[in-house]
Amino acid sequence: VKSTNLMAFVATKMLERQEDLDTCTEMQVEKMKTSTKARLKTESSFAPRTWEDAIKDEILRRSVDTSSLDKWPELKQELENVSDALKADSLWLPMKSLSLYSKVSNQEPSSIPIGEMKHQILTRLKLICSRLEKLDLNLSKAVLGIQNSEDLILIIYNRDICKTTILMIKSLCNSLI
């Protein structure tokens, strides 16, 4: 789209300076006019829009699957029942600190007031998400060195859980924005 816009712009500028085009014949100028009009006609449907127009037309709104939010009490219970080995993991602290906001988790995400609290929640969720993505990457590297089928099944299962949790966190972040 951008290259076509650029070509149409250049052709239009050339037509505006028709007196400078000594080598063009009448026929070439007419051809250029016709092709420029055709390009501009096709480009009009791709005209750039402002953010305000896009928001007004609800193009930027995405439907978010909030069914994952119903699992929050179960997830919180799992977090409280983890072993000491997991508590030493780098993921544990931000997830535990997120439980401070459990009183907000019963609300619709978009109804959380804008401000410092929402910013803190988003920051913690993004931190958790980045650490989960790093964990998923490490698990994918670990798969290559596994020779035991039970360990392989366990790693694949944990990668699926990581990916599902990452998707849940990303959808929650999108609904908070």
UniProtKB/Swiss-Prot annotation:
GO CC list: host cell nucleus; virion component
Chief location: virion
Keywords noted in UniProt: Host nucleus, Host-virus interaction, Transport, Virion
Localization in the cell: Virion; Host nucleus
Short motif (Nuclear export signal): ranges: 91-100, 117-127
Subunit and interaction comment: Binds M1 protein. May interact with human nucleoporins and exportin XPO1/CRM1.
Job of this protein: Mediates the nuclear export of encapsidated genomic RNAs (ribonucleoproteins, RNPs). Acts as an adapter between viral RNPs complexes and the nuclear export machinery of the cell. Possesses no intrinsic RNA-binding activity, but includes a C-terminal M1-binding domain. This domain is believed to allow recognition of RNPs to which the M1 protein is bound.
Name this polypeptide is given: Nuclear export protein
Organism: Influenza C virus (strain C/Mississippi/1980)
